[in-house]
Amino acid sequence: QIQAMRVMINQGIDEGGLGIGLLLDYLTSAVSEDELRMLFEVAGDRQVPIHVHVRRGYTGDNAGLIEVINLAKETNAPLFVVHVTHNAMGRVGEWLELIDRANQAGANIATETLSYAAGGTSISADVFRHRDWQGMFDITYEDVQWIATGEWLTKETWEKYSREQPGGSVNHHYVKEEWMKTALQWPRMMVATDALPAVNLSIKTNPNVAGTFSRVLGHYVRDTKLLTLSDGLARMSLYQAQWLSQASTDFDKKGRIQQGADADIVIFDPTTVQANAVYGDPYLRPTGIPYVIVGGQLVVSNGELVEGAYPGQRILGDG
């Protein structure tokens, strides 16, 4: 079976896959050591990124990070550690130091943080069903929101939704502002959205879907001056393009404004840009972004979506 999976993954990369994504923390008991090593071996052989949601134990436990760092070093796989702030929690500085040491020793490891302070996932996720999530996140039922209604849960409503709507989603509020500040100041940190799927506006999701980047520009660049404007922009554009260029040279034309680059441009006012999306009302548009250009075509004009404008094109890996 492992050999068959290896063939299928290689075929996917041949057909334009940009890398390998692994929700390891959500599949903790379903992925064997041999399967995990095989995935890293393919990423190393093909030199495409493998993005991993590492296994989590107790609060801030770095064993899951060390596991994937060792595999990346042994297989020469480009490793992307997702959501370092939400996984490392109060030990984010230690996690970043481990990544720094690995990179200094020749590894190729990157990571990202979100700009909103809650985690969002299914109420039936492995972390809730089979582990001490209250101890892990240092929260209780009252720190968890049912996304569909915005209500704060109790033990009784948690058990009710788990039983009656196991596919429903929750936001669990546990991330501290100082953790995100530590992460954002790491020299090559990237900012990610990671919103839950938004099928239509009637189905609630995370505010990440509409406010991630405007929150960085408004809160962390302008208001708190944690980042310079150029640093903030690089964390949301250039660094991602440079990372993904390992899989596709098309990304050499992304994340930068220069002759020959793709005309994907966000025009914003640094004095007014602000995220308005919040938990419970996740689709509120940001202010201070009057124009967005994709592939040379306006998709936002005077702050409004341009009806029928879909110029975006998928990018495939070089194979």
Name each region found by the language model.
Residues 16, 53, 112, 194, ...:
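Divalent metal-coordination and catalytic microenvironments
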Residues 2-3, 11-67:
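Divalent metal-binding pocket/active-site signature
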Residues 181-188, 193-196, 265-311:
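C-terminal cap of metal-dependent C-N hydrolases
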Residues 19-21, 51, 80, 110, ...:
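Structured core elements
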Residues 213, 236-237:
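N-terminal alpha-helical segment
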Residues 1-30, 69-73, 78-229:
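Active-site neighborhoods of metal-dependent hydrolases
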Residues 170-174, 180, 227-234, 242-283:
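Acidic, glycine-enriched loop/beta-strand segments at the rims
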Residues 27-31, 57-61, 87-91, 117-121, ...:
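Flexible loop/turn segments at secondary-structure boundaries
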